Structures are given as C-alpha cells and as structure tokens.
Amino acid sequence: MGKAKAPRQLKDNEAKAVARTLRVSPQKLNLVASMIRGKKVNAALADLTFSRKRIAGTVKKTLESAIANAENNHDLDVDALIVAEAYVGKSIVMKRFHVRGRGRASRIEKPFSHLTIVVREVAEKGEAA
C-alpha cells in the first residue's frame, strides 16, 4: 500500500463540480457524460435539456453547478467556458436478492456512480491571446 494519490489541482482558468452517489450505473452515466465532453457549456446544456436519458437532468444540474462555481468562486467568463473534462467513477453497489423458482434466490446488484465535471475558460478565436 503506497501513499494515496493527491487529487489533481485545478488551474486558474478551471472550475469543477462533483455529484456523488448517483443511482445509475457508471456505463449509462458515461453515455451522457461523453455527450457533453469538449463542448461549449451553452451547447452542452441544450443537449442535456433535450436528452431522453433519465440521468441527463442530474448531469445538467451538476454542469450548472460547475458554471456557477466558475462564475462566483473563480471569476471566469461564462460565455467562454467549455466542458474540459466529464468523467465517471464507480461508487457503492447495493446488493438485493430476487426470488427465483424452486426455492432459490439470485443476487441483483444496483450500482451507484460519481460524476465530476471540469469547465475551462478558453480565449475566443477572434481575440488576441
């Protein structure tokens, strides 16, 4: 057992928000997270608003939290933000049993996930850097 890995430090032009213990499998959540990765935040919010996935509302709420963190805590321009990172991690797994025939039972696993969204301020292409 080595030393615990230090969390990644945010740069000055970044802000993040984390949603923990979401009741959805990491595989399903990653489908929605990959949909917004690398997009401007306005386009990502529009995609999440009209997505038919059940978890899209929670992902939208987390993205709005990251945008609010960027604006209020880091003084970043909301119009120049992109979704730099959107990654999913495994959380706990609830175990339940399902009654089967002939007196047997089988296990049902109900997975949970963590979601982390990092937004980054980028310079507009028309501006001088």
UniProtKB/Swiss-Prot annotation:
GO cellular component: cytosolic large ribosomal subunit
GO terms under biological process: translation
Pfam families assigned: Ribosomal_L22 (PF00237)
Annotated InterPro entries: Ribosomal_uL22 (IPR001063), Ribosomal_uL22_bac/chlpt-type (IPR005727), Ribosomal_uL22_bac/org-type (IPR047867), Ribosomal_uL22_CS (IPR018260), Ribosomal_uL22_sf (IPR036394)
Keywords: Ribonucleoprotein, Ribosomal protein, RNA-binding, rRNA-binding
GO molecular function ontology, one term from the record: rRNA binding
NCBIfam families: rplV_bact
Oligomeric and partner information: Part of the 50S ribosomal subunit.
Name this polypeptide is given: Large ribosomal subunit protein uL22
Taxonomic lineage from the root: Bacteria, Pseudomonadati, Pseudomonadota, Alphaproteobacteria, Hyphomicrobiales
